[in-house]
C-alpha cells in the first residue's frame, strides 16, 4: 500500500508547496507530501519524521512582545494580546491561511469569587513585573507528543486589585501546531479563596455550536474549535456568545495553586474532525498505539477469585498460540476482578503468594507485562459488598456510590497500591472501573471530586512509567479531554448484551456497535473512536450465550472489531475454546491492525444506526491509503452507497482514485474494486456480512 518513493527531495517538494499555497491549508498539504515517509506510529499522516511540516519554517512557532502587544504565530495560526499595567486582554486570533479573524474579544480569562458582585476579569487586573517570551525546549523522552517538539510561549503575572489571587498566565504555541493553548495557574495569596468558577473562553461571533451533549464537549465555529481542556468543563452557546468554564467546589487554599487550560485551533475547510483529532493526538497523555491484550473477565474469574496457576496458564496459552506460533505482538495480560482478597483493601488473595512477580516473568517471555483491574468505588455485586464492609470497619471513606477516591484515607491507600503495582510488579496497564461523585466534595479532601482525585493519581502513575496504558471505564463519557489523562474511556451501555437479529454473536456485535453509535457517535461527535473501550472480543466460558460459536460468526466479530480502529484491543477469551482456524483469524486481524495503525488512528463512523439494522461501519485515511469496514446487521441483503470523497473525508490535494481489495487470506484472488472520489459505488452486502477494504491510491 506504500506509494513509490518520489524522485524529488522532500525538502524541495515542501518548499514548492509553500510557494504555491494560497487558500490551501499548509498542514494538510504537507501531510500529503510526507505520506511516503516511514510512519512514526500514531501520527503518521499528521506528523512524520525526520522532516515534515511540523519541522518546517512555515510551521515554526514565533513569539514577540513589542510595547503592550504580545503575539504568537506561525503560518497557520496567530494570536495577539494587549498586556499593560491595567491588565491582559485578547485582541484577536487569526487563521493564517484564509485570513479569517476572530475579532477583538476582551478578557483572556475571568474568575467568579464567592461573595463578589461580579467577575474578576484579566483586563482589570494589575500586571506584576514584565511580560516574557519563553523558549520551550523539546523533550524527546516525553510521553505527550507535543512536548517532544520545540515551542514558544508568552507569559505574564497578574493580581486582582484586592490582592487576593495571583494568576500566572501563559499562551503556548508548539512548532507545527494549528492551535494555541492558554494556561493559568491560580494562587491564593491572602488566605483561602472561594473561587467558584473559572472562564477561559468567552468569544463572540456568528454560528458557534457545542459539539456534543456531554460535559467537556468542545465548541466549534466553522473551521475553528475551542475548549476548556477538562472533562468536567461546561461549554455553552447563547446566541452568538460561546463560553467555556469550569466550577470549583473547594476554596483555593492559601499558598496553593490550581492550573487550568484551554485551546483555540483552526482547521482546513471540511477537515474539522481530522484537524481536531490531530490536536488530540499531539496533546493527549500518550499518543495512539495498538494495545493487544488478554482480559481474565468471563474466563478465569466472573465475580469469583482465581489464582496464580490459572493466570500463568492463560499467559502461556496465549503466548504459544499468538506469539510463538503466529508471530503476533502481545502487549499485556490484564487480570480483572478476582485477584484480590475481598476482606482486605486491594491486597492479593492467597492464590498469589508472590503477588504478580511470577506473572511478570512469564509475560516477559512473550514481550508483554501484566495489567490490573482496580475499582475506585469498590467493584460490583458480592465482592463489592465484602470490600465495602471491610473498608467501613477500618475507617475508609464511603458514600452511597461506594468508596470515595477523594477521601484522604482511601486515596492514600489506593495510591499506594497502584504505585506498588508499577514499581514492584511491572504492571503496564490499569483498568480503573468505576469513579463517582463528580461534583461532590468529601469533607477534609484536597480534591474537588473523585474525578479530580483520579486525575491526580494518573499523573503520578505516568510520572513513574511514561508508557503506562490507562483505561477509565464506568463513570466516563465521550469528552475528548479525558484523553489528556487516560488512554481510553468506556463506550457506554452494558458490558455485553444482545439486540437485533441473527445468532447470539451477531446480536452481540450489533449491540456493541449500537451502544457506540448512541453514546459516542451521537453524544460526542469529536471524541476519537480510536480511544474507546468497546468490551473487546468475547468468547469465554463464563460469557452467557458467547461461550460457543455454533454459527461460525467469530471471524465477523474479529474483523468488525479491529475495523473499529480502537487501540484498546481486549481479548475476553478462554484459550481452550478456540480452534486452530479461530487463532488464525485472530492473529491475522491483530497483526493487520498493528501494521495499519497509521491509518486506523483516523477511524470515524460511516453509515447508519446498527439499532435500526442499517448498514454501518468505519473509515480511516492517510496519504498512503484508506480502510473501509462495512457491516450488514440484518438477515436480508442490503446495499451501501460508497463515495470515498465523503467516506474518507478527503482533504484538498489528496489522491482521488483508489484500488480496493480485502486484506484477508480467504479473499486472495478476489478482484479489486475501483473507487473514485465523487463517484458512488454500490456495495452489495449479504446478510451479516462484514466487508473490509484496503484502498491504495492509484
Summary of predicted features, one role per range:
Residues 1-25, 34, 48-49:
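N-terminal secretory signal peptides
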Residues 19-21, 41-66:
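C-terminal segment of N-terminal export signals and the immediately downstream linker at the start
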Residues 67-155:
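Acidic-aromatic substrate-binding/catalytic surfaces of carbohydrate-active enzymes
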Residues 131-133, 138-371, 375-385, 568-611, ...:
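Conserved structural scaffold segments of CAZyme catalytic domains across common CAZy folds
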Residues 255, 454-668, 682-684, 689-692:
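Active-site-proximal substrate-binding groove within the catalytic cores of carbohydrate-active enzymes
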Residues 302, 371-425:
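Active-site-adjacent "subsite" loops/lids of carbohydrate-active enzymes
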Residues 328-339, 415-444:
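Active-site groove signature of glycoside hydrolases
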Residues 344-352, 378-399, 484-494:
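Aromatic- and acidic-residue-enriched segments that line the glycan-binding/catalytic groove
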Amino acid at each position: 500500500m506504500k506509494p513509490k518513493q518520489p524522485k524529488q527531495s522532500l525538502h524541495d517538494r515542501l518548499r514548492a508547496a509553500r510557494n504555491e499555497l494560497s487558500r490551501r491549508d499548509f498542514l494538510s498539504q504537507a501531510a500529503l507530501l510526507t505520506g511516503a515517509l516511514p510512519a512514526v506510529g500514531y501520527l503518521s499522516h499528521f506528523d512524520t519524521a525526520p522532516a515534515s511540516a511540523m519541522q518546517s519554517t512555515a510551521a515554526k512557532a514565533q513569539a514577540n512582545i513589542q510595547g503592550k502587544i504580545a503575539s504568537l504565530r506561525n503560518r497557520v495560526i496567530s494570536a495577539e494580546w494587549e498586556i499593560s499595567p491595567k491588565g491582559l486582554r485578547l485582541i484577536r486570533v487569526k487563521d493564517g491561511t484564509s485570513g479569517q479573524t476572530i475579532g477583538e474579544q476582551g478578557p483572556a480569562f475571568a474568575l467568579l469569587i464567592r461573595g463578589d458582585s461580579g467577575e474578576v476579569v484579566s483586563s482589570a487586573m494589575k500586571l506584576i513585573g514584565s511580560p516574557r517570551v519563553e523558549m520551550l525546549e523539546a523533550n524527546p523522552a516525553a510521553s505527550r507528543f507535543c512536548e517532544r517538539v520545540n515551542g514558544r510561549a508568552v507569559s505574564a503575572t497578574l493580581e486582582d486589585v484586592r490582592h487576593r489571587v495571583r494568576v500566572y498566565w501563559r499562551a503556548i504555541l508548539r512548532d507545527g501546531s494549528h492551535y494555541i493553548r492558554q494556561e493559568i495557574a491560580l494562587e491564593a495569596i491572602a488566605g483561602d479563596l472561594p473561587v467558584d468558577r473559572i472562564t477561559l473562553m468567552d468569544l463572540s461571533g456568528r454560528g458557534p455550536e457545542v459539539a456534543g451533549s456531554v460535559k467537556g464537549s468542545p465548541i466549534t465555529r466553522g473551521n475553528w474549535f475551542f475548549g476548556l481542556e477538562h472533562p468536567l468543563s461546561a461549554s455553552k452557546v447563547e446566541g452568538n456568545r460561546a463560553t467555556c468554564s469550569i466550577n470549583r467546589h473547594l476554596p483555593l487554599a492559601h499558598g496553593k495553586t490550581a492550573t487550568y487550560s484551554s485551546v483555540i485551533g483552526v482547521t482546513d475547510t471540511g477537515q474539522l474532525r481530522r484537524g481536531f483529532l490531530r490536536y488530540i493526538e499531539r496533546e493527549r497523555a500518550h499518543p495512539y498505539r495498538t494495545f493487544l491484550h488478554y482480559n481474565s473477565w468471563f474466563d478465569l474469574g466472573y465475580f469469583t477469585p482465581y489464582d496464580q496457576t490459572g493466570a500463568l496458564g492463560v499467559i502461556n496459552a496465549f503466548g504459544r498460540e499468538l506469539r510463538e506460533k503466529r508471530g503476533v505482538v502481545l502487549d499485556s495480560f490484564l487480570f480483572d476482578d478476582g485477584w484480590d482478597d475481598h476482606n482486605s483493601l486491594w491486597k492479593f488473595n492467597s492464590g498469589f503468594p508472590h503477588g504478580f512477580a511470577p506473572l511478570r516473568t512469564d509475560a516477559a517471555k512473550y514481550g508483554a507485562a501484566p495489567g490490573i483491574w482496580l475499582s475506585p468505588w469498590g467493584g460490583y455485586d458480592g465482592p463489592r459488598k465484602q470490600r465495602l464492609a471491610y473498608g467501613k470497619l477500618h475507617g475508609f471513606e464511603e458514600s452511597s456510590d461506594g468508596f470515595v477516591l477523594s477521601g484522604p484515607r482511601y486515596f492514600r491507600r489506593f495510591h499506594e497500591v497502584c504505585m506498588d503495582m508499577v514499581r514492584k510488579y511491572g504492571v503496564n496497564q490499569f483498568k480503573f472501573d468505576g469513579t463517582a461523585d463528580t461534583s461532590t466534595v468529601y469533607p477534609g479532601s484536597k480534591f474537588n471530586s473523585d474525578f479530580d482525585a483520579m486525575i491526580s493519581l494518573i499523573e503520578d502513575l505516568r510520572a513513574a512509567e511514561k508508557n503506562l496504558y490507562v483505561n477509565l471505564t464506568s463513570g466516563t463519557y465521550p469528552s475528548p479531554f479525558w484523553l489528556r489523562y487516560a488512554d481510553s474511556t468506556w463506550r457506554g451501555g452494558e458490558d455485553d448484551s444482545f439486540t437485533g437479529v441473527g445468532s447470539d454473536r451477531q446480536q452481540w456485535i450489533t449491540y456493541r456497535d449500537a451502544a457506540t453509535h448512541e453514546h459516542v457517535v451521537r453524544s460526542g461527535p469529536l471524541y476519537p473512536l480510536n480511544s474507546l473501550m468497546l468490551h473487546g472480543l468475547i468468547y469465554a466460558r463464563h460469557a452467557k450465550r458467547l461461550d460457543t460459536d455454533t454459527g461460525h460468526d467469530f471471524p465477523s466479530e474479529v474483523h468488525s472489531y479491529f475495523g473499529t480502529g480502537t487501540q484498546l484491543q481486549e481479548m475476553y477469551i478462554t484459550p481452550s475454546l478456540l480452534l486452530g482456524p479461530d487463532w488464525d483469524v485472530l492473529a491475522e486481524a491483530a497483526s493487520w491492525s498493528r501494521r495499519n495503525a497509521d491509518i486506523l488512528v483516523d477511524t470515524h463512523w460511516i453509515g447508519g444506526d446498527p439499532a435500526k439494522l442499517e448498514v454501518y461501519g468505519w473509515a480511516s485515511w492517510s496519504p498512503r491509503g484508506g480502510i473501509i469496514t462495512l457491516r450488514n446487521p440484518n438477515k436480508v441483503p442490503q446495499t451501501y452507497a460508497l463515495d470515498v470523497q465523503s467516506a474518507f473525508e478527503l482533504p484538498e490535494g489528496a489522491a482521488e482514485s483508489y484500488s480496493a481489495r480485502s486484506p484477508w487470506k480467504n479473499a486472495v484472488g478476489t478482484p479489486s474494486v475501483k473507487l473514485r472520489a465523487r463517484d458512488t459505488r454500490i456495495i452489495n452486502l449479504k446478510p451479516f456480512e462484514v466487508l473490509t477494504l484496503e484502498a491504495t491510491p492509484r
